[in-house]
Amino acid sequence: MQNYSRTDFAQVGTTNRGCMRVIPSDKEKEHDLIVVGGQNGSLICLSRKSNDTTIIFKTQPGYPVQSLALGGPASSKKKDKIFVASQNTVRGVNRKGKTFFSMETNMAEVANRMFVRGLDVVLTGRKSYSRYHDTVDSNSYLCTEDIHDVVSLVFEEAWGSREYTSILACGNSTLQIIEGNNFAYDVRLDSVPFTVSLFMGDGGHTKLLVLYGTKTGRLGLVSVPQGGGKILWEIDTTSGACVTTIVCFNVTGGQFPDIIVGKEDGLIEIYVIDETDHAHLFGTFSCDESITGISCGHVSSKSEIDIIICTFTGWLFSLAKTSRPMIENLPVAANFSVKMQQLRSEVEELQTKVNEERLRYEEITKRQGSGTGSTFFHSFQVHENFEYSAAHGAYNLTIELVIPIDFVVVQSQLPIRLMEVEKNASVVSEVRQDALNPWPLLASYRCQANVCRLELRVQANEGDSGVINLYVCPKVMPKCAQITTHYIKALSSHMRSHDFDLYRPMNTLQFTGNFSIAEAHAWLHNLLPNVPSKCPPADTITNNYQCSVNGGTQLQVVYSKGSAVFRSDCMTTICIIRDKVSEQTMKMQIRVEVACELNQDSVNHCLKLIDPKITSMLNIEKNKLYAAALKELESNNDDVFSFLSAANAKILKDHDAIYEKSEGVSIEDSGVLAILENLMVARGKLTGRSSKGRGDAIRDLISTDYSLENMQTLFKNAMND
């Protein structure tokens, strides 16, 4: 967005998602206010005038503010009452900072998300949904999946004959529609929805349209009438980062309200709406910090609209058109110089005090170095996100601090590969595993100056599981580090799916014995991602999954008391499940019977699924070699195009594009060889045959004479030997 510029307002401390709003002014000539709730529990209201930020009020610290919403009479468009959710309590504060409402709910969980309209307050915890009408508990629902966000339809005429209707964004890749106390239906998505918002602020022309943003960076629109909903459209945004906030407001001057999207990687995107309710990208802006809130209003000027953004680290800033004068009321030059001199003097005085206190602290620490005294360590919060990316076939790990990061040490129990990230402003060094270093991976990321956000990407082979420890050390004295732990599961590349193709060649693995459904659910929780820690209340549970790295093989799990059945068209998946579940049953001393039915046709089926990926990568590498050779030929010949064929001439013309496309593409680093080798080993384990030496044969075939038929022949010969 070239016509927009950033203006910083203030830094208010770390914030949670959805804890900032713009309060509309109650007088025409006054500017709108900004209210933000911090993780320290304090509520701050700010105003902006003459390029100066003023605090209107600030409440006392307390429990972290989990969610913030604006409310008012249902019949009025003006929403200037502030509602704050902390723990299981909701408070109402007016624009002057006076508390006019307080309600302690009966929720057993922390209220993470909130929606307010009129006398209705909707709260959601991790798995619970509650609606309070005039402080009375009117509706409740217990969800079996994690709830990421909630929104309610705001016009009664849109409900029809149904009760109060809310939409939940759930962790099983669905939007669940709740009518009163009951689950009405769900809308199935391809990825996990993380944010929901009413289309155009009120549900659009039908009042039944809801926008959603997913963890994979997709934006969609769904219609939720009574009886069943449908997806109207879904598009990719400019990056695959998680969508953290969606706001509808007319900032471009078009006919309809625009869609403003904030993301985990700091991108702000604006989409304009056409007459068919479809979205088109207008522009983007990057701030390199996690976005936790976006709101709009006349904060700095009554003539133009400000887009107010809040980040995790607490920065409040606006995006406004550059046509606005940067300084509205320019002060007298003499007064301005005096004020600047005063500020310089204050900064120098503070710097002197900081240096004196730092020296005094170091002396105290040295004197108490024997351990008889106590040393103060700085407390800091690590904001991190550890999510599997199907597009990259790897885990994306984001670390963000309020203070600059000095270095991060990665310590892994399993052999993982570190992948390059474009935005990673750090120097990486790895320590090889040896007698002094028992860890399969030990690496450090030393950051450049003033880096508060670090992005990493790690890749693990399917079947490997274990713990990754991160030691995060900020640039403070004395040196201290905070340890965070993440667990990579054996079937980490399997994503939840809504469909299962029964016509594929299937391998079946069944466990029977004296175990409960909760124990079977625990096995699944340790194997697969996005499985709730608690077992859903059902006699029989069925889950479908699809693998994102080997061409799209499927897995279906059906478990109940005393029985767990796994069906997959990939022998590697069946072998991993058999090994991992057997380990857990032995630890728990549960006696089970194992039955395994193999379909040899599934091997050729898996090779067909992975073939397009291998062929594409080999063609890219081949074109890269051709382009390099032709470029060298061109450097030694002025009229090279006179004797080149049309195909070779095109390769030479596309030299730069081919090299750009081939960047990061490698058969060795892609994990394709590991997929084929694991398939060979898994079939050998399940059939009782040796697969020794077959890995080298697979590598030789891919590097010399790969084709689907040759690979199928290699696997067939290995079976017959």
Swiss-Prot record:
One of its GO terms (cellular component) is non-motile cilium. It is found in: Cell projection, Cilium; Cytoplasm, Cytoskeleton, Cilium basal body; Cytoplasm, Cytoskeleton, Cilium axoneme. InterPro entries: Bardet-Biedl_syndrome_7_prot, BBS7_GAE_dom, BBS7_hairpin, BBS7_pf_dom, Beta-prop_BBS7, Quinoprotein_ADH-like_sf. GO terms for biological process: chemotaxis; cilium assembly; intracellular transport; intraciliary transport; non-motile cilium assembly; protein localization; protein localization to microvillus membrane; protein transport. The keyword Plastid does not apply. Expressed in ciliated cells including amphid and both inner and outer labial neurons of the head and in both phasmid neurons PHA and PHB in the tail at larval stages L1 and L2. Its main location: other. Keywords: Cell projection, Cilium, Cilium biogenesis/degradation, Cytoplasm, Cytoskeleton, Protein transport, Transport. Changing residue 314 to E: In my13; results in cilia with structural defects and increased accumulation of the mechanosensory receptor, pkd-2. Mutants may have slightly altered chemotactic tendencies and have vacuoles in amphid sheath cells. The keyword Cytoplasm applies. Disruption phenotype: Mutants have normal body morphology, but with reduced body length and width, delayed larval development and decreased roaming movements. May exhibit defective chemotaxis tendencies. Defective cilia structure and function. This is characterized by increased accumulation and mislocalization of intraflagellar transport proteins and impaired movement of intraflagellar transport proteins along the ciliary axoneme. Defective polycystin-mediated cilia signaling and mislocalized and increased accumulation of mechanosensory receptors pkd-2, osm-9 and odr-10 within cilia. Part of BBSome complex, that contains at least bbs-1, bbs-2, bbs-4, bbs-5, osm-12, bbs-8/ttc-8 and bbs-9. Interacts with bbs-1. Component of the BBSome complex. The BBSome complex is thought to function as a coat complex required for sorting of specific membrane proteins to the primary cilia. The BBSome complex is required for ciliogenesis but is dispensable for centriolar satellite function. Required for proper BBSome complex assembly and its ciliary localization. Required for cilia biogenesis and both the assembly and movement of intraflagellar transport proteins along the ciliary axoneme. Plays a role in the removal of degraded mechanosensory receptors within the cilia. This is BBSome complex member bbs-7. The gene is osm-12.
